[in-house]
Amino acid sequence: MKNFLLFLSIFSIIITSQAQEKANNDGWVSLFDGKSFDGWKVGENASTFSIQDGAIVANGPVAHLFYNGDVKNHDFKNFEFKADVMTTPGSNSGLYFHTVFQDSSWPQKGYEVQVNNSQEDWRRTGSLYAIEDVKEVYVKDNVWYTESIKVQGKHVTIKINDKIVVEYDEPENVQRPAGMEGRKISSGTFAIQGHDPKSKVYFKNIMVKPLD
């Protein structure tokens, strides 16, 4: 019995220590451990995603990597999210929020935040894709930058490094055109986009700060 109680005590200390280590200052929590896909789930074309030097690399046919870990049971409504991102020339990718796992195709639920500094699509990094688009190029290829998303109620703020590039308020009872019906504030998880075989984009230090 004493040995069992000792085991429970040690186990409790380990779990508490891990939880404290996982939580960063001011409520930030890591979603990616830098070495494995634990807590993530990919739909089609799993080989599009790999891990190199502590970063997720998106390079290959269309694919999406969804967070399905334990933080908030991968269901976020109000939050701050940030990731360090590096694009290579001619690359396109995206970060989804309020989405849900799909086996294939482009996510139908939630919003996409664009990652694109030089690819042919004119919508540049920081765009709330096809909703509030950014034409300016704020960062260069082959340079790490931080892309941040904050959702509070119906308000979305997107930042590139410390610069706000999008402030968007979703109208009440918003109606989207055909094919975009799912682009609405709700709740859900995050996803990383693998856009095409010519695109190679890196993601690391993926963090979330739940606000509810």
Q: Model regions: which residues?
A:
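Carbohydrate-interacting regions of secretory-pathway proteins
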Residues: 19-212
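Bacterial Sec-dependent N-terminal signal peptides
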Residues: 1-22
